Amino acid sequence: MIPKKNIKIKFLEIPIFFFFIWLCFCNSPTKADLPRGLITEGLNFYDEGKYADALQKWKSASKVGSQEADFLLGFLYDGILQNDKEALFFFEKAALSGHVQAQVNVGLKYERGEGTNVNKDKAIYWYSQAAFNQDDIAQFRLASLLQKVSGKARESHFWFAKSAELGNAEAHLALATNFILGRGVGKNLTLAHVSCNLATFLSRDIDSISRSIQLRTELETKMSTDQIKEAERLSRKCIEKKFKECMSYLIELE
């Protein structure tokens, strides 16, 4: 017969054994920790101006599947290292794994022909990917490209409106022009005035503010007092509601 004290020892040994297994597991680096650590080290090197060391760290992180490392490599090649082909390669690699900012940057590369030939179809494709992920710059650039494509005026207006909804001042100015010209939407001077007001409210640079004010001033020479008052009322309401409610009529197509 086994003594009782030995039974107690056996029951105590089992949880202690598993405790040490758990402790070792928790303290060991996971697969996710490796690229994160390499990215952080690379960022530290970048801040110190040690770009070759940053490059090495981020390439190591890229090899283990980090989309953030791919994006940072694209950023490094695009800026400091001035290599458009390598920048496009890594931006596109990150974009393919769903990195939204990388998708915008790939669109820019194809639109401008940097590191590749100009390819507007590919630019539209990549802007579309980021646009559906709620990136206002992608939505604006997509709208700008579609505006130049025959039969795409309505779709262009839609994306300008979606970008405007996210607070893009240039998109509001583009909407104003569409309402004045009836491009992709019915002519409507009141809504053009609203769009100018919102562009002025959201703009952060003097040039953009002055363009929206100038356009609004020209509009007011063609509008009645009642139209101007209505435009001002709608603008105030739109700002108070943080652009959400007003977009239903700014986005409306003919």
Report the location of each language-model feature:
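N-terminal secretory signal peptides that target proteins for export/translocation
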Residues: 1-10
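Hydrophobic face of amphipathic alpha-helices that form TPR/SEL1-like repeat modules
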Residues: 37-45, 71-81, 105-112, 141-149, ...
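Terminal, low-structured helical/coil segments at or just beyond the last alpha-helical repeat
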Residues: 207-254
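Short helix-capping/linker turns of helical repeat alpha-solenoids
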Residues: 33, 63-67, 78-80, 96-100, ...
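Alpha-helical segment of the N-proximal tetratricopeptide repeat
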Residues: 34-64, 75-78
